[in-house]
Amino acid sequence: PSRLVGSEMCIRDSLHLAPAIETLENLIEDGQGSTYDFSFIDADKINYQSYYEYSLTLVKPGGIIAIDNVLWSGQVIDENDSEPATRAIRSFNEKLYQDDRVSISMVPIGDGLTLAYKK
């Protein structure tokens, strides 16, 4: 682990070469639930909801889940856009907005980034 100067924070990093859902399931099975401070989601849009639920299990209260591409080049507001990825992100955004387990802030930078603070 790396150590930040003047801080009690320790940075852990590791590389897992497997499908993301499999890796997240394994982390939970290994007892790592509620041990992470931060999770970043930027993967296949169809599985965003699954990645989010797994991340919510892994991140401890007070932690942050950052979700990339939530504006999807503005396509999420085009109700005529029925592409599977667009529909998946639109549905995910709606569910996230109603999730009382987190407080959220959508940042309109790049392709959109949502920060979800786990209560």
Question: What is each PLM-predicted segment?
Answer:
Residues 12-20:
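Conserved SAM-binding strand-loop segment of SAM-dependent methyltransferases
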Residues 37-47:
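A short SAM/SAH-binding and catalytic strip from SAM-dependent methyltransferases
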Residues 24-29, 52-55:
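Distinct, well-ordered alpha-helical segments
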Residues 1-6, 10-11:
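Single conserved hydrophobic/aromatic residue that forms the stacking wall/gate
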Residues 47-119:
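C-terminal substrate-binding/active-site "lid" region of AdoMet-derived donor-dependent transferases
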